[in-house]
Amino acid sequence: MLPDDSAAIIGSPGRLFRINIIATVLDLVAEAWKSVRKRSDIDNSSNEDTIAGALYQELWEEWKKRGMDGPPRIENEVASRSSSSRLLPEGFIDFRFVYHWGEQDFFGMECKKVSSTGRTGKYLAEEYVNEGVMRFVTGKYCSGHDVAAMLGFVVDSNIAGSVGLVQSVLFNKQYVAKQSGQWNISKLFGNHSNLYETTHQQYGQAFHMTILHLFQEL
């Protein structure tokens, strides 16, 4: 759940507005993903950046199809810093969905491939947590934000098994990930069958951050 709005939280113009923006983003992703799956240039062997690039193209196509003339503005592979004092980026977040003019007025999403199959599945689950979830927790991505998202590209058609592996890795790292509470089904942002949420205390912040986890079969 989103915490109450606070002046200490970056990118928070209003609770209801943000809920609507995030719900819109997730709906756009779900619809655009159907088009990604139909593309001849994308398959299970495609790397994460290529898949995210295809999704970026299809997101804009879906945005145009709906005749949208307002937020969110969709950005792909954007430099990210944990502090405005840093000259060099600490990473490049896969997506920023911008909803206002301020530097931090966006909803961030990072993408990772996941699988339930053998050593590959375990490795990808660890990457999902270590190079995805932890980038939000440490503030490398979305520093000062109270909500962000992970998008899992399921490459072996087993969503439940892939989710289970991610849960297991995150459970074993819950202290470092500063996780509070359980892995829960998320219901605030629309009816998505494979949408979950976890709650973390971002390093250096007094409030908690909700990380959404959406899984889509490739």
Where are these regions (language model features)?
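Short, flexible loop/turn elements at secondary-structure junctions
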Residues: 97-101, 111-115, 154, 215-217
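Acidic-basic catalytic patches of nuclease active cores, encompassing PD-(D/E)XK
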Residues: 23, 27-81
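A short acidic (Asp/Glu
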Residues: 49, 55, 120, 160-166
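Nuclease-adjacent, charged terminal/linker segments that flank catalytic cores
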Residues: 1-20
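Non-catalytic C-terminal interaction segments of nucleic acid-processing enzymes
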Residues: 169-218
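Extended hydrophobic secondary-structure segments that form protein cores and membrane-embedded regions
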Residues: 72-79, 108-110, 150-154, 212-214
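Active-site metal-binding core of divalent-cation-utilizing nuclease and nuclease-like domains
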Residues: 72-107
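Catalytic cores of nucleic-acid endonucleases
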Residues: 113-160
